[in-house]
Design a protein with these regions (language model features):
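Hydrophobic alpha-helical positions that pack around
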Residues: 1-81, 93-95
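Short, surface-exposed loop/turn segments at secondary-structure boundaries that line and modulate
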Residues: 1, 105, 109-114, 203-210
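Generic beta-strand/beta-sheet core signal
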Residues: 68-70, 79-80, 91, 103-108, ...
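Short, structural beta-strand-to-alpha-helix junction motif
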Residues: 80-87, 148
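Short acidic, glycine/serine/threonine-rich loops at helix termini
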Residues: 1-6, 11-16, 42, 90, ...
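Terminal amphipathic helices with adjacent charged low-complexity linkers/tails
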Residues: 95-131
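Ferredoxin-type iron-sulfur electron-transfer modules in oxidoreductases and energy-metabolism complexes
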Residues: 12-15, 121-210
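Flexible, glycine/charged-enriched surface loops at secondary-structure junctions
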Residues: 49-62, 96-106, 167-170, 190-198
Length: 211
């Protein structure tokens, strides 16, 4: 975003320096999303300590959760950080209206959570990290029981390959290679993906890409 405003190639930046120290034109810059701005009224009226008292010690405040049409009550809901994820789905979303095998949380680069793991998670960054997931912006996309997971994974790799800014070669090349492997596995029934190769590819992308 900052590079685009400056007229440069829209590429991710190495941090530090963080925007608050050296952002737009290398000057201190505050970059906040609408969720952060929405919390300002409560913080200004009740005080920062009151807001920090909500949630968990490391994930304070509330979180906006977007539930898709697989729920009986879809929509955007605000919940305290630390709320059991199962409670969010059952009380706010009124549960699933069809069989679901996984939920994709936090956008394209977020985590695919099997339904069996939902009771283990709470709505905070630590819980997700400890279980190998990312909460991100907490959007929830449900994967129906009958939908082929390999097709969904191909969609994610295709998105990443298309949206990669190209700065980091593990992301630029790895996303395309992952997409090719998944496409071949679907088109050639005699081909099986080498899981060690796929794990190595994912680990390389994770370690070697800034995003």
């Amino acid at each position: 975003l900052l590079s685009s405003i400056e007229g440069q190639r829209p590429e991710v930046r190495v941090r530090p320096p963080f925007p608050v120290h050296g952002g737009l034109f290398r000057k201190p810059t505050v970059v906040n999303n609408v969720e952060t701005v929405a919390n300002l009224l409560f913080i200004c009226s009740e005080g920062g300590e009151a807001y920090a008292a909500i949630g968990t010690p490391k994930s304070t405040g509330t979180k906006l959760v977007s539930l898709d049409s697989a729920f009986f009550t879809p929509g955007i809901f605000e919940a305290d950080m630390g709320t059991p994820l199962d409670l969010v789905f059952k009380q706010l979303g009124s549960g699933f209206k069809r069989a679901v095998k996984a939920v994709h949380i936090g956008g394209p680069l977020g985590g695919l959570v099997p339904v069996s793991k939902i009771p283990d998670l709470t709505l905070d960054f630590e819980s997700f990290a400890q279980n190998g997931f990312m909460m991100g912006h907490a959007s929830v996309v449900s994967v129906p029981e009958e939908y082929p997971m390999i097709e969904y994974l191909e969609h994610l790799f295709s998105f990443t390959a298309h949206e990669s800014c190209g700065k980091c070669f593990p992301c630029r090349l790895g996303s395309t290679r992952g997409k090719e492997l998944l496409q071949k596995a679907q088109n050639d029934h005699n081909f099986k993906i080498d899981l060690k190769l796929m794990d190595h590819l994912l680990d390389t992308m994770k370690r070697g890409s800034l995003c």
